[in-house]
Amino acid sequence: MANTTIIGIAGGSGSGKTTVTNEIMKNLEGHSVALLAQDYYYKDQSHLTFEERLETNYDHPFAFDNDLLIENLKDLRNGHAVEVPTYDYTNHTRSNETIAFEPKDVIIVEGIFALENKTLRDMMDVKIYVDTDADLRILRRLVRDTKERGRSMESVINQYLNVVKPMHNQFIEPTKKYADIIIPEGGSNKVAIDIMTTKIQTLVSKQ
């Protein structure tokens, strides 16, 4: 499907990327849409010991297999189905299971580093950065990681201060300059989301 529209959605952890993504998908009813979460593409670490895997910095660009993501995107854009990897967060490596993806009218690539890789950026028709206050982002991360991932509040805060925050400032925040659209206040900014989805609907209808 050479006329596939590719949308990139980036922003820090807890910024509201998922909310924005869901709003876009909801407003694109009538078009087929696929979501490729960048988290699917954490690198395989089966060659490392479990202890070594625990030391992986998942908030660094090197943690992601962008080559495979780019290859999958090219195949989908050319009308070919792909098998997308999944990640086992318990064993900290790639799972043996994959997810079958068919070509779609619209493909959304969502992740903290969605705009970091130039080759990936150049494939995108629309680049979005979800910009949310750091205090709100850490609060959302606290709720998510303690409730959904069973982590202690202390471990989440320590990880944020020692890894997440410095990686955000070094690698994620600078990608804001590549965005066509910046959405302040994340998913709660209904006006910005409405304007953005209207633009995307117009673009998709022309493809």
Swiss-Prot record:
It is found in: Cytoplasm. CDD domains: UMPK. The keyword Glycoprotein does not apply. One of its GO terms (molecular function) is uridine kinase activity. InterPro entries: P-loop_NTPase (IPR027417), PRK/URK (IPR006083), Uridine_kinase (IPR026008), Uridine_kinase-like (IPR000764). Its EC number is 2.7.1.48. It catalyses: uridine + ATP = UMP + ADP + H(+); cytidine + ATP = CMP + ADP + H(+). Disulfide bonds: none annotated. Pathway: Pyrimidine metabolism; CTP biosynthesis via salvage pathway; CTP from cytidine: step 1/3; Pyrimidine metabolism; UMP biosynthesis via salvage pathway; UMP from uridine: step 1/1. Keywords: ATP-binding, Cytoplasm, Kinase, Nucleotide-binding, Transferase. ATP binds at residues 11-18. The keyword Magnesium does not apply. One of its GO terms (biological process) is CTP salvage. Belongs to the uridine kinase family. This is Uridine kinase. The lineage of its organism: Bacteria, Bacillati, Bacillota, Bacilli, Bacillales. The gene is udk.
